[in-house]
């Protein structure tokens, strides 16, 4: 720093507290445009040595330096005569800053010592022109939270290394919030990155490592060669999770929901959640409970239990999950949001989500990014998630980071949401415990995600039958010689006189005896008397059972009027005002109900009865096709008003959320929500049904099969806009055939409602009936405003959902020569063309529920056509799509024996729809003519 500039700076009155903010603003201006500040100030700022980081990141440290000088300028007045000392002072502060930014790159993280990062020049004092001669000099430490104002440089460097280059590598300087950074600095710098634990706590950590290792060795001996996806090498996960639960309990948490993949899952089930070892052994032996459906492999199964902590009982729930990595994460978040909504405490610490990831999967699977992007979105936030990465440095056979990812760390994705990231060596259980408490406290304090990167290794192959040395020879040579985490820590405690060899041996023997006994090995386990009531009213119900379908006409009109009334202070957009005026007319009985009016009235009747409704999707508030307008936007000030939230004071909650632009994570979230909250009608709407296949993993692994595999009921509704209107291959088909292909054992319902009354009753049936199974709806687009797709108030008040609808025109059944069966929008094309042709010999029958197929209802509809032997199934979709291939066996069952069943529709096609309107129109006319023309 130039001597003249320093003297002028120290002599000036700008250091007074009143001008501190002025200096900070001046520096901000300099960072933005150096020419915008006075030449003297610019010269001084330019002489500040660089740190290799961005100017805005460096600014916070310089600003703190200014603040300290402003507090006690006299402390530095003597330095005027020695400007070199002042220059070194700034360099010392920059050295501190360098450790905060990049100390993690020199941390001792890899238990095997194989993973090495390049040396960081910034961490060398010489880089900052600090020499060994300066080591005995005292310098102000700025904001370094060690509890001292000044330290000798040598001592300061030692403290920085202990804090940032030990078994913990802290990454947090990417966070923009100064408050959050200061909080982390206070927590880790005040103890130099090393918390103090009592002898009892250390013994507990050893005991938990003993359990983690003991179970794996026991299973390996008892069931050699069986897949168990061992935790060995990452044993510290067990004490980490147990410490997390203990600390959460003391912090007021009452529920913990965990999601994890296969690695270490069996260990967590037994040693953390308290599953009986004997039950696990039975699963290895192939025994199963008959009532659990088709079942699943043991390392996919969930579990729940109650654990005693110092703060009270904590309910633990480990989510069921498939082998599709990372997809369980948004399911967990959805489950947690449901529990928070049930408590009506969205920012509460009472429910804690913990997601456990693999190092290869957390970087490789896009659903991780989608889930992180939801973490602060209003409809999906849960007050932060503790995200633990079991970083065993290998993904199946891929261990070269240049193959696995494009970032230095597997956790770098966490920086997109400014989550702090704490890397920790899994062979140091005390560092693991310290980081665990730190991470949870950060999450609880700031309501944000936090990552723990548990740096470990995988002692065996991907599974126990795999031979890893074929692809990782050097790594596995090292692993064979490397002692286990339990052995390393037992030796340390013996050396520190905390335990003896006999103590450690006794722990091993006692745990093995407990496994032999087969009973629970988690002493904190308590009888589970919480949460078990939730699903009992929804057991053992069938899809066709009756439900309270009627609503008194007077009440229905009152509700219709209430949800179509907006306060005068709300200035509505003109088209929206017209829609609401029409709904007022519908409520008065002056107009027939359209789709949007009937749908929103269904929600009103449910919340009126205290039943919550949650609706989410990319444009759910308005509706992709401008039909719903559940949320009204004030044109004068941008505020919003949701009429369905103002039915009456004691109503059920109505929440509608415009989702982030995601299918996979959002649908998984809503599945998790619905499986945790059966009382809420949970609905996910795709922007177009075509885009739902972005969530195909959720549909295949959870929605269609979750009950059969895991016994998990779910009442989720999927609204998938579907219909051929000439909009091309990406805006026509929700892929009805794929859902029908997944249907078996009455696992879900697939409906194609064709009238407003049908959607009204379908939604009410889903909420009011006891059965909780997914409902997949091919919802309309053009029918939303079709003049024939309307329903009367009487149909809403006194009707019910009809899985099949017969002929509506007055045709003489005896004169009918052909019956055309169909679903969805094509019905209206057929109806209008038949009326135009003045045909009396073709009846049109609608199948509104394609699965479970309504055999009885269809037989009732068709009984008047017993003389007919010419039947046609008409669909808009190509031959190889739609319902034809999946459902024709049902059609044949309900038509008279020996009758012909013919297809009318588009020819087989690789693409769902054509891209040219003229071709579309010709195809549409051809299929309608084909269905109606009787030779």
What feature does the model see in each segment?
Residues 11, 48-237, 253:
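Extended, charge-enriched "interface" segments that sit outside catalytic cores
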Residues 485-486, 496, 500-613:
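Hard-cation-handling environments
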Residues 99-102, 106-139, 143-154, 159, ...:
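Glycine/aspartate-rich loop-and-adjacent alpha/beta segment that forms the canonical ThDP
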Residues 94-111, 243-272, 357-372, 376, ...:
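Conserved phosphate/anionic-ligand binding catalytic regions in large, soluble enzymes, centered on
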Residues 254-418, 422, 625-677:
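Cofactor-binding active-site loop characterized by glycine-rich and histidine/acidic residues
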Residues 7-48, 55:
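Subset of Sec-pathway N-terminal targeting signals
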Residues 193-215, 281-344, 643, 753, ...:
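Active-site cores of enzymes that catalyze phosphoryl transfer or operate on phosphate-rich substrates
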Residues 2-8, 16, 50, 59, ...:
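Thiamine diphosphate
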């Amino acid at each position: 720093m130039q001597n003249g500039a320093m003297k002028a700076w120290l002599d000036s009155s700008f250091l007074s507290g009143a001008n501190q903010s002025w200096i900070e603003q001046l520096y901000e201006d300099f960072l933005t445009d150096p020419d915008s500040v006075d030449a003297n100030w610019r010269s001084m700022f330019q002489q500040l040595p660089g740190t290799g980081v961005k100017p805005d990141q460096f600014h916070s440290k310089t600003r703190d330096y200014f603040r300290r000088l402003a507090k006690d300028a006299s402390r530095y007045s003597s330095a005027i005569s020695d400007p070199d000392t002042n220059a070194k002072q700034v360099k010392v502060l920059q050295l501190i800053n360098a450790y905060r930014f990049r100390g993690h790159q020199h941390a001792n993280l890899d238990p095997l010592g194989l993973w090495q990062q390049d040396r960081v020049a910034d961490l060398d004092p010489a880089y900052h022109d600090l020499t060994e001669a300066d080591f005995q000099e005292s310098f102000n430490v700025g904001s370094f939270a060690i509890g001292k104002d000044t330290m000798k440089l040598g001592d300061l460097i030692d403290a920085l290394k202990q804090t940032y280059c030990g078994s913990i590598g802290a990454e947090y300087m990417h966070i923009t919030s100064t408050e959050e950074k200061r909080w982390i600095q206070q927590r880790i710098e005040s103890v130099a990155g090393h918390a103090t634990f009592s002898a009892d706590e250390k013994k507990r950590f050893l005991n938990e490592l003993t359990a983690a290792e003991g179970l794996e060795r026991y299973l390996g001996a008892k069931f050699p060669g069986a897949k168990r996806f061992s935790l060995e090498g990452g044993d510290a996960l067990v004490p980490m999770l147990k410490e997390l639960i203990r600390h959460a309990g003391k912090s007021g948490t009452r529920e913990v929901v965990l999601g994890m993949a296969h690695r270490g899952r069996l260990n967590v089930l037994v040693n953390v959640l308290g599953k009986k070892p004997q039950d696990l052994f039975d699963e290895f032996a192939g025994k199963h409970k008959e009532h659990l459906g088709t079942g699943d492999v043991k390392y996919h199964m969930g579990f729940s239990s109650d654990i005693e902590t110092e703060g009270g009982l904590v309910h633990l729930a480990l989510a069921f999950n498939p082998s599709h990595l990372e997809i369980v994460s948004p399911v967990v978040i959805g489950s947690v949001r449901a529990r928070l909504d049930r408590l009506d405490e969205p920012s509460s610490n009472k429910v804690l989500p913990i997601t456990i990831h693999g190092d290869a999967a957390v970087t490789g699977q896009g659903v991780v990014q989608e889930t992180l992007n939801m973490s602060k979105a209003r409809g999906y936030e849960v007050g932060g998630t503790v995200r633990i990465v079991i970083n065993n440095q290998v993904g199946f056979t891929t261990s070269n980071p240049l193959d696995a990812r494009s970032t230095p760390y597997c956790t770098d994705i966490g920086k997109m949401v400014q989550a702090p990231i704490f890397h920790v060596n899994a062979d140091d259980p005390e560092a693991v415990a310290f980081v665990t408490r730190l991470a949870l406290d950060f999450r609880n304090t700031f309501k944000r995600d936090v990552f723990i990167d548990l740096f470990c290794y995988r002692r065996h192959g991907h599974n126990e039958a795999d031979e890893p040395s074929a692809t990782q020879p050097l790594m596995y040579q090292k692993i064979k010689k490397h002692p286990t985490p339990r052995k390393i820590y037992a030796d340390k405690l013996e050396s520190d006189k905390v335990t003896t060899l006999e103590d450690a041996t006794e722990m091993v023997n006692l745990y093995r005896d407990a496994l032999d006994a087969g009973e629970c090995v988690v002493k904190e386990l308590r009888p589970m008397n919480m949460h078990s009531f939730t699903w009992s009213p929804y057991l053992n119900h069938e899809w066709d059972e009756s439900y309270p379908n009627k609503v008194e006409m007077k009440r229905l009109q009152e509700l219709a009027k209430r949800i179509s009334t907006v306060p005068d202070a709300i200035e509505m957009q003109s088209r929206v005002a017209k829609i609401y005026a029409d709904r007022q007319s519908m409520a008065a009985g002056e107009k027939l109900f359209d789709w949007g009016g009937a749908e929103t009235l269904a929600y009103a009747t449910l919340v009126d009865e205290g039943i919550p409704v949650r609706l989410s999707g990319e444009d759910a508030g308005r509706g992709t096709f401008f039909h719903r307008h559940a949320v009204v936007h004030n044109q004068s000030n941008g505020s919003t008003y949701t009429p369905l939230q103002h039915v009456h004071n004691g109503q059920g909650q109505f929440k509608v959320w415009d989702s982030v632009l995601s299918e996979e994570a959002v649908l998984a979230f809503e599945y998790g929500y619905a499986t945790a909250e059966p009382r809420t009608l949970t609905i996910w709407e795709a922007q177009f049904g075509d885009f739902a296949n972005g969530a195909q993993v959720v549909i295949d692994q959870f929605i269609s099969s979750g009950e059969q595999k895991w016994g998990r009921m779910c009442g989720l509704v999927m609204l998938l806009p579907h219909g051929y209107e000439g909009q091309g291959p990406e805006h026509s088909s929700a892929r009805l055939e794929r859902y029908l292909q997944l249907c078996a054992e009455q696992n879900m319902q697939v409906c194609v409602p064709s009238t407003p009354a049908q959607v009204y009753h379908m939604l009410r049936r889903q909420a009011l009936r006891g059965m909780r199974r997914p409902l997949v709806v091919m919802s309309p687009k053009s029918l939303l405003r079709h003049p024939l797709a309307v329903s009367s108030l009487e149909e809403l008040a006194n009707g019910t959902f009809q899985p099949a609808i017969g002929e509506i025109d007055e045709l003489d059944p005896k004169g009918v020569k052909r019956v055309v069966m169909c679903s969805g929008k094509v019905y209206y094309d057929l109806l209008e063309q038949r009326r135009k042709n003045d045909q009396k010999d073709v009846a049109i029958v609608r199948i509104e529920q394609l699965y479970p197929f309504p055999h009885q209802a269809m037989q009732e509809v068709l009984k008047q056509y017993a003389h007919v032997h010419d039947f046609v199934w008409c669909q808009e979709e190509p031959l190889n799509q739609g319902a034809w291939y999946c459902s024709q066996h049902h059609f044949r069952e309900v038509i008279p024996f020996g009758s012909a069943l013919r297809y009318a529709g588009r020819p087989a096609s690789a693409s769902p729809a054509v891209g040219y309107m003229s071709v579309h129109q010709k195809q549409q006319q051809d299929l309608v003519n084909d269905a109606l023309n009787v030779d």
